[in-house]
Structure formats: structure tokens, C-alpha cells
UniProtKB/Swiss-Prot annotation:
EC number: 1.3.1.98
MF GO annotations: FAD binding; UDP-N-acetylmuramate dehydrogenase activity
Ranges of residues in domain FAD-binding PCMH-type: 13-183
Active site, per annotation: 159, 229, 325
Principal localisation: cytoplasm
Organism superkingdom: Bacteria
Pathways involved: Cell wall biogenesis; peptidoglycan biosynthesis
Full protein name: UDP-N-acetylenolpyruvoylglucosamine reductase
Entry annotated with the keyword Cell cycle: yes
GO cellular component, one term: cytosol
Gene: murB
């Protein structure tokens, strides 16, 4: 007996898992993990499946993390939120704004659960989770022991954290602690936000502008399956960026604190005239080249072939090799996404 994963991944790819368990508390989560381990099955914990591509049927147990709850403590200088890992991220952003606690508005409409946010160190429009994260609570899957990691201990990087490295498959995130400063400073460095006046802008206006940009550029997964930005924005050495800018002076580029330069993957793909290109049922989105969509009952093979095609074209033109932001899941667990499309 197998269970379809189609409802549990926003790409809408139709693969199956041996078992799917919905965990609404820590005990259910640990019990499901221990049961699978006893049976010698692979096991993975999934939020809303908005950043994964299942390559084939999964041979084990998928645990859906649905631990809910939001607690707020107010101090003189900040609001401290303790949020269950199974809460929806965008609903949390709205909750904070509705309760006059600004600071998350640039991260509006990022799909997925709160518990997934530190894994990827989610970010958009100049703000990353690490800017507001206070701590992450997790449990060791083998022992059931509770751990609280400070933001520094999470070792956040660009779409990276300790949870994608040493702690992968070792812990389950059960809650995230956020600190929202009462000295709110709008971040208006990207897109339409640069048109807003930092002296008069409200958090609600930033939220509305971010939602407008995302809804006009990004496809709704309910209409066309997708996992948001498929590729990371490449971060390259300064000399490589200089060389590229000599050839393409209008290329968007963002100098980083360490001297490296972040490039816009969507722009690179667009310059290769790849918008609308299809392989099988998979397509490059016509409005936002960074997004690959399930346009017509795509298989995972279609998506992988399209991602390979995009990576090759960009690499040949710019000598910059894109890496997927989406996580690739094989029969027994996560596999190397770069190798899968190389």
C-alpha cells in the first residue's frame, strides 16, 4: 500500500510514499520517526512541500510537521514570538502585521511552514530569516532530547544553515523564536520597494507592495505547480563579476559584505531567451524566468531535464553555473541537486 505525495508537494508531481503520517505534537512526530526507524525505513519530515522535488517514489515514511501555536512576549524594545513549526509562514506574517508587530513584511507570501524557514534561511527583498531569528527549538530524533539553538549556532548562510548540514536528518524543528524590534526600519532596497519613501512608509505599505510584486510575477501553485525560485541567485568572486559586467554592463548585481557579488539568476536565464521554453510538461515561467512550472502533468524527469537545459545555456553564455534552491528527494532521501542536473 502506498500513498500519493501529489497533495503534499506544490510542484504537484505524482509520486508515492510507503507511509504518510501527520504529526500534530512532538510525541506523534517522535513516535512516527521511531516506528519507521524500527522498520528500517527511510524517513523524512516535510512542511508544506513548497521547496522539494520528488524524483521518484519515496521508499519510506513522510512525516508532515503540523505543530501549531503562536505565543507573544513583549519587552521594552521588542516583541518575542515563539511559533510552532507547522504554522504557515505567510499567515504568521499577516498575524504579526495585524497585531502591529512589523518586521516580517518583506517575507510576505513566501510559501511553506515556519519550521522550514531556518533550514533555508528564507529571504526576499533584502531581508533574510537570520535578521529576525532569535532561536530555533528542535528535538534530537534518536533521543527525544530538546535543543535550543541561538541564531549564531544555526550558522545561517545564503539559503543555508546547520539544518542542511550537520543536523540534517538528526533533528526535527519544533518551534522558531523571532525577535521583532520596536525600532522598525523599513528595508526598501529591491524592486518596487525602492519607490517608497522611507520617511513616511508603513509596514502595511511594504507588505502590500511585496504581495503585489509576488502575485504579478510568480505563478500560483494551485494553478501551475511550482516550488518558487528554482535556482539560487549565484554568488561569484569579484573578478568574475567584473568580467561579466564588462560584457553585460546592465546585469543586475549586488555586492556582498565579504567582497563577493550576488547576480540575479532570473536575469541570466532571461538573457538566454528561455522564458516559455518547455520540455515535456515542464516549462520556464513566462513572467519570472527563475521559476520552473508544472505546466501540463509534468514528470520529475521533465523538470530535471528542463533544469539541466537552463543550467547549460546560462553556463555556456555567462560561465556562471546555477545551483538549484529546490531540494531533490530520491527513493531513500535527499540527493545532490547540482549533480542531478549537471
Amino acid at each position: 500500500m502506498t500513498h500519493s505525495l501529489k497533495p503534499w508537494n506544490t510542484f504537484g508531481i505524482d509520486h508515492c510514499a510507503k507511509h504518510i503520517v501527520c504529526a500534530e505534537n512532538e510525541q506523534q512526530l517522535l513516535s512516527a520517526w521511531q516506528q519507521a526507524t524500527r522498520e528500517g525505513l527511510p524517513v523524512m519530515i516535510l512542511g508544506e512541500g513548497s521547496n522539494v522535488l520528488f524524483l521518484e517514489n519515496y521508499a519510506g515514511t513522510v512525516i508532515l510537521n503540523r505543530l501549531k501555536g503562536i505565543e507573544v512576549n513583549e519587552t521594552a524594545d521588542a516583541w518575542h514570538l515563539h511559533v510552532g513549526a507547522g504554522e504557515n509562514w505567510h499567515q504568521l506574517v499577516r498575524y504579526a502585521l495585524d497585531n502591529n508587530m512589523p518586521g516580517l513584511e518583506n517575507l510576505a507570501l513566501i510559501p511553506g511552514c515556519v519550521g522550514s524557514s531556518p533550514i533555508q534561511n528564507i529571504g526576499a527583498y533584502g531581508v533574510e530569516l537570520q535578521c529576525v531569528c532569535d532561536y530555533v527549538d528542535c528535538v534530537e530524533l534518536e533521543t527525544g532530547k530538546r535543543l535550543r539553538l541561538s541564531a549564531a549556532e544555526c550558522r545561517f548562510g545564503y539559503r543555508d544553515s546547520i539544518f542542511k548540514n550537520e543536523y540534517q536528518d538528526r533533528v526535527a524543528i519544533v518551534a522558531v523564536g523571532l525577535r521583532l524590534s520596536k525600532q522598525w526600519q523599513p528595508v526598501l532596497t529591491y524592486g518596487d520597494l525602492t519607490c517608497l519613501d522611507p520617511k513616511t512608509v508603513t509596514a502595511q505599505q511594504v507588505f502590500d507592495a511585496v504581495c503585489h510584486m509576488r502575485t504579478t510575477k510568480l505563478p500560483d501553485p494551485k494553478v501551475n505547480g511550482n516550488a518558487g525560485s528554482f535556482f539560487k541567485n549565484p554568488v561569484v568572486a569579484a573578478d568574475i563579476a567584473m568580467e561579466l559586467l564588462e560584457r553585460f554592463p546592465n546585469a543586475p548585481h549586488y555586492p556582498q559584505a565579504d567582497g563577493s557579488v550576488k547576480l540575479a539568476a532570473g536575469w541570466l536565464i532571461d538573457q538566454c531567451q528561455l522564458k516559455g521554453v518547455t520540455i515535456g510538461g515542464a516549462a520556464v515561467h513566462r513572467q519570472q524566468a527563475l521559476v520552473l512550472i508544472n505546466a501540463n502533468d509534468a514528470t520529475s524527469k521533465d523538470v530535471v531535464a528542463l533544469a539541466h537545459h537552463v543550467r547549460q545555456k546560462v553556463g555556456e553564455k555567462f560561465n556562471v553555473w546555477l545551483e538549484p534552491e529546490v531540494r531533490f528527494i530520491g527513493q531513500f532521501g535527499e540527493v545532490n541537486a547540482v549533480e542531478s542536473i549537471a
